[in-house]
């Protein structure tokens, strides 16, 4: 992927080069549009967003443009409490969280899914003020929103739109037609699902796929092909640009190389392995740990799941002076001692450890991980005080976050 992104034909071309000199680059963008139309089942794609959160903002701005074009004033956005945290921030940035709008939370049932009774109450309360709903699917607990289509139908009946947070797309890519599911806009993180390195501060990248009604409002340019030439065309009612030129173009090349390597069937296989890996690990660990949300243990997981300690294990930690709220972050540091990246802790469940193996690891590696997680629990049972001083084998025990934020070093001499 990096080899492809570093080819001189890509790296040496200025983003404002004439169309006739940019045919190779425009072809890549056009191909990505077509690939993600097939992957999502949606007829429109923009490649401009630089990250998942910016993709969300694109989606909500498209919603606003669509309603404005119909001379409708809709100032309410519905978001489940189980959604990704960026959804709430994005809705605020789009104007729904201030004086001109309102973010309304949807409660979850015992399995972590959207509580339909609560949705019905919100629909009754806000009616045609609802611009749309944002739902992460599968949700952050790794559970598929089985009533998604019914939710979409209710929102569409009001004239609202449906945004699906596609950050967990690696669980369903190639398996589900999002257009048939009722999705109007969805982002895909290229820096997570589609081979771009995840973490380390970026740079991220994304695409946004949309339903037919939102295509005229897409940002940036659509790349059209007439059989001979690739041409950038600005949509009729475009909401403008969210970034200069073509986004993180080198990431588009990396993603394109990955898609070509996978092929259509490989995309489906990638998702299948991600789900299989998560279910295999969950089956290995569910007897030793409790599963969150409480009451959802029997629900099949997709690509990830959330573990926590059992009641008696929390009691043992409290006996040595460690509060429940501090347990998950401390356990995460023990993962570092065992040579694994620390999991996401205390979110979306305050006492949770989020486990997401993805599609990248062999069964042997999954088994090694499961053994380590079981060993961590055994260590906690036998020596609960070990959590207080974790991690034990890293070069830095604890990051001084306050000092790091206040005493910022923006340049470092190379002659030290």
What are these regions (language model features)?
Residues 1-44, 49, 58-61, 116, ...:
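Non-catalytic terminal extensions of PLP-dependent enzymes
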Residues 24, 54-227, 237, 322, ...:
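Conserved PLP-enzyme active-site core in the AAT-like
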Residues 66, 105, 144, 163, ...:
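Aromatic side chains
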Residues 110, 142, 246, 268-272:
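A short glycine-/small-residue-rich loop at the edge of a beta-strand within enzyme catalytic domains
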Residues 243-254:
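PLP-dependent aminotransferase class I/II
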């Amino acid at each position: 992927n990096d080899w492809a992104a570093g080819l001189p034909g890509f790296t040496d071309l200025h983003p404002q080069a004439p169309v006739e000199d940019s045919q190779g680059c425009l072809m890549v963008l056009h191909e990505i549009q077509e690939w993600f139309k097939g992957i999502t089942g949606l007829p429109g794609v923009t490649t401009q967003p630089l990250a998942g959160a910016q993709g969300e903002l694109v989606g909500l701005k498209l919603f606003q443009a669509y309603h404005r074009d119909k001379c409708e004033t809709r100032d309410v956005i519905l978001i489940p409490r189980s959604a990704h945290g960026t959804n709430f921030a994005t809705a605020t940035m789009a104007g729904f969280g201030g004086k001109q709008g309102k973010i309304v939370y949807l409660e979850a049932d015992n399995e972590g899914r959207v509580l339909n009774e609560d949705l019905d109450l919100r629909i009754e309360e806000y009616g045609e003020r609802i611009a749309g709903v944002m739902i992460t699917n599968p949700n952050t607990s790794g559970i598929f929103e089985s009533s998604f289509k019914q939710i979409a139908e209710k929102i569409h009946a009001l004239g609202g739109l449906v945004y699906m947070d596609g950050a967990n797309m690696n669980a369903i890519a190639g398996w589900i037609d999002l257009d048939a599911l009722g999705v109007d806009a969805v982002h895909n993180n290229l820096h997570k699902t589609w081979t771009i390195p995840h973490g380390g501060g970026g740079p991220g990248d994304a695409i946004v796929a949309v339903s037919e009604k939102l295509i005229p409002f897409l940002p940036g340019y659509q790349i059209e092909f007439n059989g001979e030439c690739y041409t950038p065309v600005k949509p009729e009612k475009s909401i403008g640009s969210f970034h200069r030129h073509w986004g993180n173009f080198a990431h588009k090349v990396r993603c394109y190389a990955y898609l070509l390597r996978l092929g259509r069937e490989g995309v489906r296989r990638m998702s299948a392995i991600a789900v299989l890996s998560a279910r295999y690990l969950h089956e290995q660990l569910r007897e030793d740990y409790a599963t969150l949300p409480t009451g959802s243990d029997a629900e099949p997981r997709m690509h990830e799941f959330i573990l926590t300690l059992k009641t008696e294990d929390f009691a043992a930690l409290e006996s040595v002076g460690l509060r429940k709220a501090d347990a998950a972050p401390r356990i995460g540091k023990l993962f570092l001692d065992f040579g694994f990246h620390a999991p996401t802790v205390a979110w979306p469940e305050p006492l949770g450890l989020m486990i997401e193996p993805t599609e990248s690891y062999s069964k042997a590696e999954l088994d090694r991980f499961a053994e380590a997680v079981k060993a961590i629990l055994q260590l906690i049972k036998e020596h609960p005080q070990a959590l207080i001083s974790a991690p034990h084998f890293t070069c830095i025990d604890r990051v001084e976050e306050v000092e790091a934020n206040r005493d910022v070093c923006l340049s470092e001499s190379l002659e030290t």
